[in-house]
Amino acid sequence: MKIATYNVNGVNGRLPVLLRWLEENKPDVACLQELKAPHEKFPFQAIKGAGYNAIWHGQKSWNGVAILSKVGKIEEIKRALPGDEEDVQSRYIEANINGIRIVCLYLPNGNPAPGPKFDYKMGWFKRLQVHAKELYALNIPVVICGDYNVMPTELDVYKPERWVDDALFRPEVRAAFNELIAQGWTDAIRKLYPNDTIYTFFDYFRNAYVRNAGLRIDHFLLNPHLDKRLVAAGVDLNVRGWEKSSDHAPVWIELAD
């Protein structure tokens, strides 16, 4: 089973890129972030035409998450991260597909830091830690994937010295990610490639993609049920080079049946 995560940076504006990627790479499940579209503007018919069912949680102009599947019914569990009923940003959706609990998330950016946006990010992270612990306690396979807006280590960022005070790399943020790992979750990419330079995001400016000046901020966290089934993982870097592509590249894992 192949599961992918892709921050599409506007699902309608990048629809040709998304559909081409789905056709060429054929993930069984695809988790999308940054739809930047209200619920009624999600291109469901085009997605359906590509062979996928979908659930989504949209928001006008900002955020938005979706889960696509071509391998089974999508049973929606949640469409908001528990812990703050006043949080109306569309950043979280959770579902069961073929016996796997799949979480698709778009963690806040947090810049500028310090400030209210950074406080929101850290609060969101704390809520995620609480819910992740509950998910970990379930005796079922669970994956938490998406755009975490965190580079966990210096290996995950081009020229880390330039990012010391950024909300994606501040010590508090990296510590929060490591607290998730400490619960027992496996960072899928790092399990298979512990020492490789791997990036998933390349800024549109300064030819970042051409220079391989990137960040690794899109992650798969697996519980032990899925950790033992992990057979492959990677980044579809070539997609980032397509015309009118997102500034993220799709990331994927492959699980043994």
PLM region spans:
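Surface-exposed cleft-lining segments at the edges of enzyme active sites
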Residues: P82-G83, P108-F125, E161-D166
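Active-site beta-strand/loop signature of hydrolases that rely on acidic residues for catalysis
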Residues: I3-N7, L22-E40, I102, H131-E154, ...
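Surface polyanion/phosphate-binding segment centered on an Asp-His-Pro turn
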Residues: G234-D257
